[in-house]
Amino acid sequence: MKPSDVRSKAFAMPLTSPAFPMGPYRFVDREFLIITYRTDPDRLREIVPEPLQVTEPLVHYEFIRMADSTGFGDYTESGQVIPVEYNGQPGGYTLAMYLDDHPPIAGGRELWGFPKKLASPTLHVNTDHILGTLDYGKVRVATGTMGYKHKELDIDEQTKRLAGPNFLLKIIPHVDGTARVCELVRYYMQDIKMKGAWTGPASLELAPHALAPVADLPVLEIVEARHLVADLTLGLGEVVYDYLAQ
Protein backbone atom coordinates (compact mmCIF):
# COMPACT_ATOMS: atom_id res chain seq x y z
CA MET A 1 0.00 0.00 0.00
CA LYS A 2 1.40 3.38 -0.99
CA PRO A 3 1.80 6.17 1.59
CA SER A 4 -0.80 8.21 -0.29
CA ASP A 5 -3.27 5.33 0.05
CA VAL A 6 -2.57 5.11 3.77
CA ARG A 7 -3.25 8.85 4.14
CA SER A 8 -6.47 8.69 2.16
CA LYS A 9 -7.82 5.67 4.03
CA ALA A 10 -6.60 6.50 7.53
CA PHE A 11 -9.49 7.13 9.92
CA ALA A 12 -9.18 4.68 12.80
CA MET A 13 -7.41 1.44 13.68
CA PRO A 14 -7.10 -1.18 12.33
CA LEU A 15 -6.63 0.56 8.98
CA THR A 16 -8.38 -2.20 7.03
CA SER A 17 -11.21 -2.68 9.55
CA PRO A 18 -11.71 0.34 11.85
CA ALA A 19 -13.17 -0.30 15.30
CA PHE A 20 -15.89 2.30 14.62
CA PRO A 21 -17.36 3.99 11.53
CA MET A 22 -17.43 7.61 10.50
CA GLY A 23 -20.41 9.58 11.78
CA PRO A 24 -22.82 11.17 12.13
CA TYR A 25 -23.57 9.29 15.34
CA ARG A 26 -27.33 9.14 15.86
CA PHE A 27 -29.00 7.64 18.94
CA VAL A 28 -32.64 6.54 19.00
CA ASP A 29 -34.56 6.19 22.29
CA ARG A 30 -31.47 7.03 24.33
CA GLU A 31 -32.51 6.66 27.96
CA PHE A 32 -30.94 8.53 30.88
CA LEU A 33 -31.15 8.22 34.65
CA ILE A 34 -29.34 11.29 36.01
CA ILE A 35 -29.04 11.67 39.77
CA THR A 36 -27.56 14.99 40.88
CA TYR A 37 -25.94 15.08 44.29
CA ARG A 38 -23.99 17.41 46.52
CA THR A 39 -20.38 16.46 47.28
CA ASP A 40 -17.14 17.77 48.80
CA PRO A 41 -16.19 21.02 46.98
CA ASP A 42 -12.48 20.63 47.78
CA ARG A 43 -12.37 17.26 46.05
CA LEU A 44 -14.06 18.73 42.98
CA ARG A 45 -11.51 21.51 42.74
CA GLU A 46 -8.69 18.95 42.98
CA ILE A 47 -9.85 16.98 39.93
CA VAL A 48 -11.42 19.56 37.58
CA PRO A 49 -8.74 20.93 35.21
CA GLU A 50 -8.41 24.67 34.68
CA PRO A 51 -9.48 26.72 32.77
CA LEU A 52 -12.73 24.97 33.75
CA GLN A 53 -14.17 26.36 36.96
CA VAL A 54 -16.30 24.59 39.57
CA THR A 55 -19.32 26.74 40.40
CA GLU A 56 -21.30 24.46 42.72
CA PRO A 57 -20.34 21.35 44.71
CA LEU A 58 -22.54 19.13 42.53
CA VAL A 59 -22.10 15.94 40.51
CA HIS A 60 -24.44 14.39 37.94
CA TYR A 61 -24.24 10.62 38.25
CA GLU A 62 -25.50 9.15 34.97
CA PHE A 63 -26.75 5.77 33.82
CA ILE A 64 -27.40 5.79 30.06
CA ARG A 65 -29.05 3.05 27.99
CA MET A 66 -28.30 3.17 24.26
CA ALA A 67 -30.10 0.34 22.49
CA ASP A 68 -29.94 1.85 18.98
CA SER A 69 -26.86 3.86 18.00
CA THR A 70 -25.16 4.44 14.66
CA GLY A 71 -22.17 2.15 14.31
CA PHE A 72 -21.84 1.63 18.06
CA GLY A 73 -24.71 -0.83 18.46
CA ASP A 74 -26.52 -1.65 21.70
CA TYR A 75 -24.79 -0.72 24.95
CA THR A 76 -25.04 0.90 28.38
CA GLU A 77 -22.86 3.52 30.04
CA SER A 78 -22.43 4.98 33.52
CA GLY A 79 -20.29 7.68 35.08
CA GLN A 80 -19.91 11.15 36.58
CA VAL A 81 -20.34 14.58 35.00
CA ILE A 82 -19.40 17.73 36.94
CA PRO A 83 -21.18 21.07 36.36
CA VAL A 84 -18.54 23.66 35.38
CA GLU A 85 -18.04 26.99 33.62
CA TYR A 86 -15.67 27.81 30.78
CA ASN A 87 -15.17 31.53 30.16
CA GLY A 88 -18.51 32.14 31.83
CA GLN A 89 -20.28 29.46 29.76
CA PRO A 90 -21.96 26.78 31.91
CA GLY A 91 -21.52 23.17 30.88
CA GLY A 92 -20.58 19.71 32.09
CA TYR A 93 -17.13 18.11 32.48
CA THR A 94 -17.10 14.35 32.02
CA LEU A 95 -14.86 12.87 34.69
CA ALA A 96 -15.11 9.18 33.74
CA MET A 97 -17.51 6.85 31.95
CA TYR A 98 -17.77 3.07 32.20
CA LEU A 99 -19.40 1.00 29.45
CA ASP A 100 -19.73 -2.48 28.01
CA ASP A 101 -19.03 -2.09 24.28
CA HIS A 102 -15.69 -1.71 22.47
CA PRO A 103 -16.60 0.51 19.46
CA PRO A 104 -17.86 3.45 21.57
CA ILE A 105 -14.89 3.03 23.93
CA ALA A 106 -12.44 3.23 21.02
CA GLY A 107 -14.36 5.92 19.16
CA GLY A 108 -15.08 7.94 22.26
CA ARG A 109 -11.43 8.02 23.33
CA GLU A 110 -9.88 8.52 19.89
CA LEU A 111 -12.30 11.06 18.39
CA TRP A 112 -13.57 13.21 21.24
CA GLY A 113 -11.39 12.25 24.18
CA PHE A 114 -14.11 10.62 26.29
CA PRO A 115 -12.54 9.06 29.42
CA LYS A 116 -14.08 5.64 28.84
CA LYS A 117 -13.23 2.32 30.50
CA LEU A 118 -14.65 -1.19 30.14
CA ALA A 119 -17.12 -2.25 32.84
CA SER A 120 -20.64 -3.65 33.27
CA PRO A 121 -23.39 -1.04 33.72
CA THR A 122 -27.15 -1.68 33.50
CA LEU A 123 -30.30 0.45 33.35
CA HIS A 124 -33.82 -0.96 33.39
CA VAL A 125 -37.25 -0.67 34.98
CA ASN A 126 -37.59 -2.88 38.05
CA THR A 127 -41.34 -3.10 38.79
CA ASP A 128 -42.11 0.37 40.21
CA HIS A 129 -38.72 2.07 39.87
CA ILE A 130 -35.92 2.58 37.39
CA LEU A 131 -32.68 0.94 38.49
CA GLY A 132 -29.14 1.71 37.38
CA THR A 133 -26.10 -0.31 38.42
CA LEU A 134 -22.37 -0.31 37.68
CA ASP A 135 -20.14 -3.32 38.28
CA TYR A 136 -16.38 -3.10 37.80
CA GLY A 137 -15.26 -6.70 37.60
CA LYS A 138 -17.12 -8.47 40.39
CA VAL A 139 -17.56 -5.34 42.53
CA ARG A 140 -20.80 -3.31 42.55
CA VAL A 141 -19.55 0.29 42.65
CA ALA A 142 -22.78 2.23 41.95
CA THR A 143 -26.51 1.71 42.47
CA GLY A 144 -29.08 4.35 41.58
CA THR A 145 -32.86 4.19 41.88
CA MET A 146 -35.74 6.52 41.09
CA GLY A 147 -39.49 6.12 41.37
CA TYR A 148 -40.79 5.35 37.88
CA LYS A 149 -42.42 8.35 36.16
CA HIS A 150 -43.77 9.93 39.34
CA LYS A 151 -43.91 13.45 37.86
CA GLU A 152 -43.45 14.83 34.35
CA LEU A 153 -40.82 17.48 33.70
CA ASP A 154 -41.00 20.30 31.17
CA ILE A 155 -39.85 18.93 27.80
CA ASP A 156 -38.48 22.24 26.50
CA GLU A 157 -36.46 22.89 29.65
CA GLN A 158 -34.94 19.40 29.63
CA THR A 159 -34.12 19.70 25.92
CA LYS A 160 -32.31 22.96 26.59
CA ARG A 161 -30.34 21.40 29.44
CA LEU A 162 -29.31 18.43 27.31
CA ALA A 163 -28.23 20.76 24.50
CA GLY A 164 -25.68 22.61 26.64
CA PRO A 165 -21.92 22.32 26.09
CA ASN A 166 -19.92 19.39 27.38
CA PHE A 167 -16.18 19.31 28.07
CA LEU A 168 -13.59 16.54 27.89
CA LEU A 169 -9.88 16.29 28.65
CA LYS A 170 -8.43 14.45 25.64
CA ILE A 171 -5.08 12.78 26.31
CA ILE A 172 -3.18 10.71 23.74
CA PRO A 173 0.41 9.64 24.47
CA HIS A 174 3.33 9.72 22.04
CA VAL A 175 5.14 6.47 21.24
CA ASP A 176 7.76 7.34 23.87
CA GLY A 177 5.11 7.72 26.56
CA THR A 178 5.09 11.52 26.66
CA ALA A 179 1.92 13.47 25.95
CA ARG A 180 1.31 14.05 22.24
CA VAL A 181 -2.24 15.36 22.63
CA CYS A 182 -3.51 17.08 25.77
CA GLU A 183 -6.52 19.23 24.94
CA LEU A 184 -9.74 20.52 26.41
CA VAL A 185 -12.50 19.55 23.98
CA ARG A 186 -16.04 20.94 23.78
CA TYR A 187 -18.92 19.13 22.12
CA TYR A 188 -22.72 19.34 21.94
CA MET A 189 -25.68 17.02 21.64
CA GLN A 190 -27.52 17.99 18.45
CA ASP A 191 -30.91 17.50 16.78
CA ILE A 192 -32.48 16.54 20.09
CA LYS A 193 -36.01 15.16 20.10
CA MET A 194 -37.05 14.78 23.72
CA LYS A 195 -39.66 12.03 23.99
CA GLY A 196 -40.21 12.06 27.73
CA ALA A 197 -38.85 13.52 30.96
CA TRP A 198 -39.77 12.58 34.51
CA THR A 199 -38.61 12.94 38.10
CA GLY A 200 -39.27 11.12 41.35
CA PRO A 201 -37.73 10.15 44.68
CA ALA A 202 -34.20 8.86 44.20
CA SER A 203 -31.26 7.20 45.91
CA LEU A 204 -27.61 6.73 44.99
CA GLU A 205 -25.03 4.46 46.61
CA LEU A 206 -21.34 4.52 45.63
CA ALA A 207 -18.71 2.01 46.78
CA PRO A 208 -14.91 2.30 46.79
CA HIS A 209 -12.84 0.70 44.06
CA ALA A 210 -9.18 1.28 43.17
CA LEU A 211 -9.83 1.41 39.41
CA ALA A 212 -13.37 2.80 39.34
CA PRO A 213 -13.12 5.51 42.02
CA VAL A 214 -16.64 6.90 41.75
CA ALA A 215 -16.88 7.01 45.55
CA ASP A 216 -14.02 9.52 45.72
CA LEU A 217 -16.77 12.11 45.22
CA PRO A 218 -19.00 11.15 48.17
CA VAL A 219 -22.77 11.53 48.14
CA LEU A 220 -23.68 14.11 50.78
CA GLU A 221 -27.21 14.94 49.61
CA ILE A 222 -29.46 14.04 46.67
CA VAL A 223 -30.44 17.27 44.91
CA GLU A 224 -32.37 16.11 41.84
CA ALA A 225 -33.21 13.04 39.75
CA ARG A 226 -34.28 12.87 36.11
CA HIS A 227 -35.35 10.08 33.78
CA LEU A 228 -35.11 11.17 30.13
CA VAL A 229 -35.77 9.48 26.79
CA ALA A 230 -34.56 11.23 23.64
CA ASP A 231 -33.36 10.84 20.07
CA LEU A 232 -30.18 12.83 19.44
CA THR A 233 -26.99 13.15 17.45
CA LEU A 234 -23.62 13.18 19.19
CA GLY A 235 -21.84 16.10 17.56
CA LEU A 236 -18.12 16.09 16.89
CA GLY A 237 -15.88 18.24 19.04
CA GLU A 238 -13.72 21.34 18.92
CA VAL A 239 -10.51 22.09 20.81
CA VAL A 240 -10.94 25.08 23.12
CA TYR A 241 -7.65 24.83 25.05
CA ASP A 242 -4.33 23.15 24.20
CA TYR A 243 -2.33 22.35 27.33
CA LEU A 244 0.84 21.57 25.35
CA ALA A 245 0.79 24.95 23.60
CA GLN A 246 0.91 26.90 26.86
Curated annotation (Swiss-Prot):
Domain of life where this protein originates: Bacteria
A single GO molecular function term of this UniProt record: acetoacetate decarboxylase activity
Membrane spanning residue stretches: none
Catalytic activity reported: acetoacetate + H(+) = acetone + CO2
Keywords: Decarboxylase, Lyase, Schiff base
The EC number(s) this enzyme carries: 4.1.1.4
Enzyme type, top EC level: lyase
Active site positions: K116
Any Pfam family hit: ADC
NCBIfam families: PRK02265.1
Function description: Catalyzes the conversion of acetoacetate to acetone and carbon dioxide.
Family classification: Belongs to the ADC family.
The name this protein goes by in its record: Acetoacetate decarboxylase
Species whose genome carries this gene: Burkholderia lata (strain ATCC 17760 / DSM 23089 / LMG 22485 / NCIMB 9086 / R18194 / 383)
Taxonomic lineage of the native organism: Bacteria, Pseudomonadati, Pseudomonadota, Betaproteobacteria, Burkholderiales
